[in-house]
């Protein structure tokens, strides 16, 4: 039987992309920025190695170990030295950033958690094989269509997940083996952590979003650890500190559009991260008790983003 991960990787690597950019070498920072921009526009990258080396002047460039390039008609442009972390378990472990939110709450962000091309392989698999649904939910007593696709995977025997009047169908981990590979990679960078459920979300464009909320359901306990892996188009992830009365009463705050509500918060009471393709964000401690978070609408986010949030149901 053909491995769906291998086949999707082959399809992606063989697809040309039109970029409208002239030939020439650019810096690593410019290359990464360009990659993120093109990913959000639905463009795909092809990975090349030493045997495919070339440059503007037509001379062999044997010093380049690994590059990504775009095709536009017969022109080629190389993005030099874009080398992803080989493996979360390698001796050259991916660098991480810790953000202390205060009062026992913190975040961990690993931008290059998974290798670049492998992340696209996972993206293709998830986009095509997950049974996505866009359910009707209830917000402030009104029924509306959830502004993103979703799916739920969990171990057997767990308390059912219910949010906004919606109870998703629970699929088995065995239904989607690549999810176990991603979970194993998380365990390698978060030793001692444990997760038994997964909520998947797919944002298909600029109008898809998630409003202000906290993942403070009782089934997760008072200090849940939530590991969030992102694939595809990068999107902003915004946190806002709850009001004192909201935090003490366990309320999740208002559910209004994140972009509008954000303007009412002070800079000290908010955090914003741009979650990259293949990145890992971990929320820990009392983050769900004291903070709410959102993924706002973004006019320039034309591509699809898939996000996996691993959780532990007690």
UniProtKB/Swiss-Prot annotation:
It catalyses: a methylated nucleobase within DNA + 2-oxoglutarate + O2 = a nucleobase within DNA + formaldehyde + succinate + CO2. Substrate binds at residues 132, 160-163, 216. Signal peptide: none annotated. It is found in: Nucleus. Fe cation binds at residues 213, 215, 293. It comes from the Eukaryota. Expressed ubiquitously, including in seedlings, leaves and flowers. Dioxygenase that repairs alkylated DNA containing 1-methyladenine and 1-ethenoadenine by oxidative demethylation. Accepts double-stranded and single-stranded substrates, with a preference for dsDNA over ssDNA. Confers resistance to methylating agents such as methylmethanesulphonate (MMS). This is DNA oxidative demethylase ALKBH2. It comes from Arabidopsis thaliana.
């Amino acid at each position: 039987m053909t491995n769906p991960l291998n086949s999707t990787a082959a399809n992606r690597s063989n697809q040309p992309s039109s970029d409208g950019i002239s030939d020439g070498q650019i810096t690593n920072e410019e290359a990464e920025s360009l990659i993120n921009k093109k990913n959000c526009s639905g463009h795909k990258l092809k990975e090349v190695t030493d045997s495919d080396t070339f440059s503007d002047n037509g001379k062999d460039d044997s010093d380049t170990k690994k590059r990504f390039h775009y095709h536009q008609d017969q022109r080629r442009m190389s993005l030099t030295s874009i080398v992803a972390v080989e493996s979360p378990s390698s001796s050259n472990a991916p660098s991480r950033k810790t953000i202390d939110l205060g009062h026992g709450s913190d975040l961990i962000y690993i931008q290059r958690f998974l290798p670049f091309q492998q992340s696209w392989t996972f993206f293709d698999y998830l986009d095509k094989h997950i049974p996505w649904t866009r359910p009707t939910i209830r917000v402030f007593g009104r029924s509306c269509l959830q502004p993103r696709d979703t799916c739920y995977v969990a171990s057997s025997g767990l308390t059912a997940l219910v949010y906004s009047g919606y109870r998703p169908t629970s699929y088995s981990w065995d239904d989607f083996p690549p999810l176990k590979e991603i979970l194993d990679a998380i365990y390698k960078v978060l030793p001692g952590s444990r997760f038994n459920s997964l909520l998947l979300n797919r944002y298909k464009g600029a109008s898809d979003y998630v409003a202000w909320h906290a993942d403070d359901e009782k089934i997760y306990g008072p200090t849940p650890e939530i590991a969030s892996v992102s694939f595809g188009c990068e999107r902003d992830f915004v946190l806002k500190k709850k009001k004192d009365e909201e935090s003490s009463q366990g309320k999740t705050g208002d559910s209004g559009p994140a972009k509008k509500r954000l303007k009412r918060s002070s800079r000290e009471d908010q955090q914003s991260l741009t979650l990259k393709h293949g990145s890992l964000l971990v929320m820990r401690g009392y983050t769900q008790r004291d903070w709410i978070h959102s993924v706002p609408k973004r006019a320039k986010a034309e591509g699809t983003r898939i996000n996996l949030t691993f959780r532990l149901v007690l």
